[in-house]
């Protein structure tokens, strides 16, 4: 180093001869829609976002299916509370489970097979302890959840909002300040 030396030359020599600056190439090959492709960073991010849309859509559809199933069971339990004495008489008078199920599915009860199986699977003490208020509260909360889940599936902006929220959580959990600078080199 000399006093009258060019600072740019010195810096370039430091970058070249030391590990002050490192350059390396990346061969990014990824499956995009099931096809292997060489992609750049932008394409990788777009593919990730498309994947997130698919994941959140499937997850929401699954949660919606489970919520609708639970709603159907709760409707059956609330309906069963109105005729609990007749249901107990029918179950006691039946010779086996199949006859009791058929009786619950026919007039005057007309429960679905899922609801009838749920009622038959419950123990007698559970049938008597069912609280209409608790069941109705759970059903109301479940219906709000169903509306919310259906809203996510129906509205692309809402779906994007969910993706944004989840990515923000990931960013907050794993964020560290970048130590080095990423640059693009044509050479």
Task: Give residue spans per PLM region.
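C-terminal interaction appendages of subunits in large macromolecular complexes
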Residues: 1-187
């Amino acid at each position: 180093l000399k006093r009258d030396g060019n600072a740019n030359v010195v810096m370039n020599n430091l970058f070249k001869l030391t590990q002050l600056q490192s350059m390396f190439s990346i061969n990014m090959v990824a499956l995009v829609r099931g096809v292997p492709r060489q992609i750049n960073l932008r394409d990788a991010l777009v593919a990730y976002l498309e994947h997130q849309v698919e994941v959140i859509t499937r997850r929401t559809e699954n949660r919606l299916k489970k919520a609708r199933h639970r709603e159907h069971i709760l409707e059956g339990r609330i309906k069963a509370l109105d005729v609990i004495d007749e249901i107990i008489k029918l179950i006691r008078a039946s010779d086996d489970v199949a006859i009791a199920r058929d009786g619950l599915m026919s007039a005057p009860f007309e429960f679905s097979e899922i609801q009838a199986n749920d009622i038959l699977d419950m123990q007698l003490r559970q049938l008597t302890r069912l609280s209409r208020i608790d069941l109705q509260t759970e059903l109301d909360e479940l219906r709000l959840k169903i509306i919310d889940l259906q809203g996510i599936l129906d509205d692309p902006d809402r779906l994007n909002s969910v993706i944004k929220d989840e990515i923000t959580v990931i960013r907050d959990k794993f964020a560290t300040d970048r130590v080095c600078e990423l640059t693009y080199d044509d050479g």
